[in-house]
């Protein structure tokens, strides 16, 4: 992927945020946001493939709140509502998770782990397996469509689900937080 632009670089109330986009011939949008302070570090990215091939997005969250509380999430997030996507050869989730409803834009393979900072590297091999599977899917299909309406339900659902807007409103103000959510994170909803 190639760096495209920096959408935002903010500082407020002891918190920093950067929001960037990247390009690739097979992706409509690839975006990442990094939010950090002395007390926490949150990284989120979603890759939106070009359309016409029924491919999922790939999403990843790495959230560190303190030394002993880190949450790792990565998944194939299908743009169709009520569509249980599954990738053979990868582990299936063993439980339901708050915020992540399998079959409703989240796959059976959603990977969620709670760990410490020291344990994060233990999950790199699994992340590489997921990312390799995603890369293989995209390279096999070579998506080329640009119909962003395919992501309308997905982004609308994520806008309602994601707690980042409320968190950021307290740090950067409601107007900036709403702009990040609607103009950067989930633009198609």
Identify the function of each model-found stretch.
Residues 44-150:
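Extended, non-transmembrane interaction/recognition domains
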């Amino acid at each position: 992927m190639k760096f495209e632009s920096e959408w935002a670089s903010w500082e407020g109330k002891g918190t920093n945020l950067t929001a960037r986009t990247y390009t690739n011939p097979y992706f409509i949008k690839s975006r990442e946001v990094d939010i950090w302070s002395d007390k926490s570090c949150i990284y989120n990215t979603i890759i939106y493939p070009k359309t016409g091939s029924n491919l999922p997005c790939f999403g990843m969250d790495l959230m560190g709140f303190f030394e002993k509380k880190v949450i790792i999430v990565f998944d194939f997030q299908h743009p169709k509502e009520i569509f249980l996507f599954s990738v053979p050869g990868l582990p299936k989730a063993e439980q339901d998770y708050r915020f992540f409803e399998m079959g409703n834009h989240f796959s059976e393979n959603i990977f969620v782990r709670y760990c410490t900072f020291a344990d994060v590297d233990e999950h790199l091999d699994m992340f590489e397996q997921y990312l390799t599977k995603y890369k293989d899917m995209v390279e096999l299909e070579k998506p080329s469509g640009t119909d962003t309406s395919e992501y309308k339900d997905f982004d609308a659902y994520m806008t309602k689900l994601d707690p980042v807007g409320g968190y950021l409103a307290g740090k950067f103000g409601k107007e900036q937080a709403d702009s990040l959510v609607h103009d950067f994170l989930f633009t198609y909803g």
